[in-house]
């Protein structure tokens, strides 16, 4: 193969399969939509990162009634192969040689997003554990940068207070300094990346948070618990 590291996978012999079918000239079966095969390589990467066992174990623990890992795979593959909205990504299910999802409700894609958000920190730790073990990740330099996303909504999110006026939760979509100079509510997002260019973690902040005020809380929440050795932070 062109990529030497793929040799172990190319040398594996698979059982021969025989297919027999008959078509007539002019039959709709003569025309087919191209099918995607490249996700087979990405499947292996997800397995090496331990995401297949992570989602499977949590599905059993939480007794989810839908294929949360199937939806997650579809979202990941779609983002890499053919980026689209979440709903349109689900509709790409039939574009794969073997559909990712079998019997499913498309609306469960939004439940999957909730699951990923609720377990973000656990997912990041699982990925990092396997990158340290299998790819020997031990960054000497960690890079950090901040960007933001704007939302086409009329008003920013309101903060939530208790009966005594104490702040319970701060709204995320706030008016701030938009990178695209739009006068719309934004959300700040900080990204950590290792010296190999591989993302480590992300963290979001209310849109009116200044960039330099995001580093310390993001570092404490996402990096301090990953047991990295000494490193230089470039922000």
Where are these regions (language model features)?
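Phosphate/diphosphate-binding loops
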Residues: 228-235
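Short Pro/Gly-enriched beta-strand edge/turn motifs at strand-loop
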Residues: 169-175
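Short, glycine/acidic-rich beta->alpha junctions
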Residues: 69, 214, 235
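Conserved beta-alpha junction segments in alpha/beta enzyme cores
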Residues: 176-180
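Active-site beta-loop-alpha junctions of metal-dependent nucleic acid enzymes
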Residues: 203-225
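Conserved helix-loop functional segments at active or binding sites
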Residues: 95, 115, 220-228
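Dynamic "connector" segments at or just before major functional cores
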Residues: 1-169, 183, 189-208
């Amino acid at each position: 193969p062109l990529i030497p590291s793929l040799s172990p996978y190319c040398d594996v012999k698979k059982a021969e399969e025989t297919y027999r079918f008959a078509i007539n000239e002019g039959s709709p079966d003569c025309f087919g939509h191209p099918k995607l095969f490249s996700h087979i390589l990405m499947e292996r990467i997800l397995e090496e990162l331990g995401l297949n066992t992570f989602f499977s174990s949590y599905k059993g623990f939480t007794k989810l009634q839908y294929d949360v890992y199937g939806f997650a795979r579809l979202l990941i593959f779609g983002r890499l192969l053919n980026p689209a909205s979440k709903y349109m990504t689900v509709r790409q299910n039939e574009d794969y040689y073997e559909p990712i999802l079998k019997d499913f409700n498309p609306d469960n894609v939004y439940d999957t997003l909730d699951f990923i958000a609720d377990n973000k920190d656990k997912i990041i730790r699982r990925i990092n554990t396997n990158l340290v073990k299998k790819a020997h990740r031990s960054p000497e330099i960690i890079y950090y940068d901040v960007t933001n996303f704007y939302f086409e909504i009329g008003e920013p999110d309101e903060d939530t207070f208790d009966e005594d006026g104490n702040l319970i939760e701060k709204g995320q979509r706030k008016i701030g300094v938009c990178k695209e100079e739009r006068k719309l509510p934004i959300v700040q997002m900080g990204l950590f990346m290792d010296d190999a260019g591989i993302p480590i973690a992300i963290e979001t902040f209310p849109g009116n948070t200044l960039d330099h005020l995001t580093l310390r809380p993001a570092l404490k929440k996402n990096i301090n618990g990953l047991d990295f050795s000494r490193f230089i932070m470039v922000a």
